[in-house]
Every structure is written in C-alpha cells, then in structure tokens.
Amino acid sequence: MVERMKKDTGDETKTKVQEEPPSPSPPPPPPPRRERQKQHYWVPEREKKQIERHIHRTSHAREFTDKPWRQPRLFSETTLPKIVLEEESIPQAQKRRQAHERELLQIKDHRERMIRGRELLQQRLKDRILRKSPSQIPLPEKRDQVKKQKKEFEKVVAYPLVQPSCTSRIKVDVLMEKSQDEEDLSTIIKPFGRRFLAVPPFLRTQIGKIKDL
C-alpha cells in the first residue's frame, strides 16, 4: 500500500511539474542610443539679428533680476537741489541787455569776416590775372576786331523758281548775312522820308536846257 501511494504521489508530482508552464525569457537589452548628428540650417541675416537682440535683452533682464536689492539712501546722504536766493538772481532787464550785447558782438564779427573774405577774394583774382601772360589778355583794338568779325544774319522770304501751277506759291524763309553797307546806310539820318518818282531821260534834257537859259 505504501509503495503504491508513493508511486501515486510521484506520478502526481511528475504531472504537476509537466503541467507548470515554462518561465518567460527576460527581454533583450535595449540597443545603445546613438547621438544625434548636429544639423546646421541657414538663417537669414535679418532673423539672425533679431535672435541676437532677443538674447541680449534676456541676458540684460536676467542681470537686472540677479542684482541684490539695494537699501534706500538715508535722508542725510541724499543731495538736495541748490536754492538760489532772490538777492543773487539776475534781473530780467539785465538779462535782456546782456543778450542784446552778445547779438551785437556776433553781428560785428560776422561783418568783419565778410569784409575780410571779400578782400581775400579780390586779391586772389588780381594775382590770377597777373600770373597770366600779357598775350592772353586781349587788347582793346583786338576786342573791336573780334566784334567786327561777328556776322549778323537776317531772315528773308524767297520763292523757288519751280512753283506748282494748281496751288499757291511756296514761300521759303532764308537766313542771309547782313552787308556792312546796309548797316552804314541805316545809320545815316535822312531828312525826309518821302519817295519821289524817277525823272525820264527826255525830261532831264529839257530841264537842263531851261536852267541854262
């Protein structure tokens, strides 16, 4: 009986051992983390300046907050404004007189500077003229010759030789040089502006005979 019980208990243990599920295997260790490669991005100049300004502002604010709290000054250490007594104050009339004197001095200095500058300018012009050779300075006779050499033109209406038959005549404005004889004649003062008809030749002979008689 005892052996049979032992056998039965042995079979039960065997079945119990066989029925127990296998223990799960431990998970594999995680792979080692790889460091991310640094990536560089192009930033425009304007955005870069804005970022720098923002960093500067934040650092300035951080410095201000990090400063230790300062104790207020005592009343004895504070500097009070200087109080001017009425006796020391300058009257208004004296101030006006002093301002007027300063303006007069400024005007006087300005006039002196203007006169001095004018004198220096005239002196420089004289020196520049004296430096030039006498051949470059035109004499009065040469000036008259240059004036005479200048030509004057006048506008004259001309008609071409070939004219169209069905339309009106063609007019052309031409610039012609003025002759000096015409200028001399124009300078002569005429006593009368009347125009007389020309005497025919046969009458001239008769008039001459009458005068001879």
From Swiss-Prot:
Residues covered by region (Disordered): 1-70
Listed Basic and acidic residues bias regions: 1-19, 43-53, 60-69
Compositional bias segments (type: Pro residues): 21-31
InterPro entries (UniProt xref): ZNRD1-AS1
Tissue specificity as recorded in UniProt: Expressed during spermatogenesis, initially at pachytene stage with abundance increasing in round spermatids and decreasing again during spermatid elongation.
PANTHER family in UniProt: RCG43477-RELATED, ZNRD1 ANTISENSE RNA 1-RELATED
Described purpose of this protein according to its UniProt entry: May be involved in male sterility.
Name the record gives this protein: RNA polymerase I subunit H
Name of the coding gene: Polr1has
